[in-house]
């Protein structure tokens, strides 16, 4: 299959790409699973609370069992007391979900194919800026009429990375750094021709 190459001057060319990588039928369940697995793996998982056994103090019975008129109590660290332990205390855990390599690759194929069908995938010959300046990148994006985009290049240049840091609706990545969440999180995805070929090698 062929994809159009967009140039700032308006002239357009084409590039041949794999039908497998860019013409796959969309599988919503698979993409959902890949996105959930990726986001779960990104969780820090360091939350920790103390149970009644772990809170310091509370070893002595606060008052005798009978005769005071008050409710019976065995420890001041009961979960129903202020300063007591937590009933079902959260503990550090690993939220990572297993996703087979073939499934992950297929999910990326589905996303790229759907972006292409929705005209959200923009192929360009190359994309870079001469200086690490936000203004330079904004001007470059304006040539393609873009304000919300992920830019994917074969090798991420330092100038492009530094220029994009102050634009919260613009992301940059090399092919290896692309993930399902970033691909679906932007309005458009700009891919250079060398990056496109690398995608084919990995996914095709």
UniProtKB/Swiss-Prot annotation:
GO terms for molecular function: rRNA binding; structural constituent of ribosome. The keyword Electron transport does not apply. It holds the Pfam family Ribosomal_L4. Keywords: Ribonucleoprotein, Ribosomal protein, RNA-binding, rRNA-binding. One of its GO terms (biological process) is translation. Coiled coil: none annotated. One of its GO terms (cellular component) is ribonucleoprotein complex. InterPro entries: Ribosomal_uL4, Ribosomal_uL4-like, Ribosomal_uL4_dom_sf. Residues 47-69 are annotated as: Disordered. Part of the 50S ribosomal subunit. Belongs to the universal ribosomal protein uL4 family. One of the primary rRNA binding proteins, this protein initially binds near the 5'-end of the 23S rRNA. It is important during the early stages of 50S assembly. It makes multiple contacts with different domains of the 23S rRNA in the assembled 50S subunit and ribosome. This is Large ribosomal subunit protein uL4. It comes from Cellvibrio japonicus (strain Ueda107). The lineage of its organism: Bacteria, Pseudomonadati, Pseudomonadota, Gammaproteobacteria, Cellvibrionales.
